[in-house]
Curated annotation (Swiss-Prot):
Thylakoid as UniProt keyword: yes
Gene: ccsA
Descriptive protein name: Cytochrome c biogenesis protein CcsA
Membrane topology: Multi-pass membrane protein
Highest taxon above the source species: Eukaryota
Length: 312
């Protein structure tokens, strides 16, 4: 009872803090001068990280097993992963771009986890025999950390595509005469003062998005690879085969292939930027199919802890 109450308190405290942090981010996005307010939001994410950590530890102690046995626990761990990805660059380089992605991602996942949809599995149950293995921590934690990093990196690529598309659309309007000559003449005058600085800022932003997208996706790909390999070893111990082409395994392999292609395109300078970002955007959709969409089916060797099983 005590652990359940503590878990309930930590869940709502962390969710409330993340909600406040998102609001602060929106305010600082509109008013750049409020530096102290932004610093408060960063401290809020750190507090959220420790609250979610306390929540996971509490659930671990109360259940007797690592809290990664169902969809609710994996969503909480995913939210924890987003917070972890947020605070590490903050302490090292104070990366502002990444925080715009990790904050909303954390509140989205934790908000869904604490919603009424998953109420029936909020209480920890007995671990099913298939999950009673020392590989649980290694395999599932690496997979969730991989998903979190890949999602963040993919969202950075989506932002890169949006900015690039807006820039190209403006150039398209100019080249096809959709803007009248007098307007272009006035614009050319302004280019001597503000256009160069604006384009420099946009170019720097695109480069940063591309750089951090690559860095975060590389990290996520490493986690995903470790997760798949450890899962194969676990599968051999549990089911007698390293690979069974289960729906979850198949989509995890597809996810790995997509991001392997992304990393391969990065070796070609001409394919960096928007071209590789398109592949990462496709990967973003594939991750959600692998992580959440397959659970909707409720079939296969990974059907335990699925979304549909919560209502059976």
């Amino acid at each position: 009872m005590i652990f359940s109450t503590l878990e309930h308190i930590l869940t709502h405290i962390s969710f409330s803090i993340v909600s406040i942090v998102i609001t602060i981010h929106l305010i600082t996005f509109l008013v750049d001068e409020i530096v102290k307010l932004y610093d408060s939001s960063e401290k809020g994410i750190i507090v959220t990280f420790f609250c979610i950590t306390g929540l996971l530890v509490t659930r671990w102690i109360s259940s007797g097993h690592f809290p990664l046995s169902d969809l609710y626990e994996s969503l909480i761990f995913l939210s924890w992963s987003f917070s972890l990805i947020h605070i590490i660059p903050y302490f090292k380089n104070n990366v502002l771009i990444l925080s715009k992605i990790t904050g909303p991602s954390a509140i989205f996942t934790q908000g869904f986890a604490t919603s009424g949809i998953l109420t029936e599995i909020h209480q920890s149950g007995i671990l099913v025999p298939a999950l009673q293995s020392e590989w649980l921590i290694m395999h599932v934690s690496m997979m969730i950390l991989g998903y979190a990093a890949l999602l963040c990196g993919s969202l950075l690529s989506v932002a890169l595509l949006v900015i690039t598309f807006r820039k190209n659309r403006k150039l398209f309007y100019k080249s096809n005469g959709f803007v009248n000559e007098s307007f272009l003449l006035g614009e050319n005058v302004l280019e001597n003062t503000s256009f160069s600085a604006k384009n420099y800022y946009r170019s720097q932003l695109i480069q940063q998005l591309d750089y951090w997208s690559y860095r975060v996706i590389s990290l996520g790909f490493t986690f995903l690879t470790i997760g798949i390999l450890s899962g194969a070893v676990w599968a051999n111990e549990a089911w007698g085969s390293y690979w069974n082409w289960d729906p979850k395994e198949t989509w995890a392999f597809i996810t790995w292939i997509v991001f392997a292609i992304y990393l391969h395109t990065r070796t070609n300078i001409n394919l960096r930027g928007a071209n590789s970002a398109i592949i990462a955007t496709i990967g973003f959709l594939i991750i959600w199919i692998c992580y959440f969409g397959v659970n909707l089916l409720g079939i296969g060797l990974h059907s335990y802890g699925s979304f549909t099983s919560t209502f059976n």
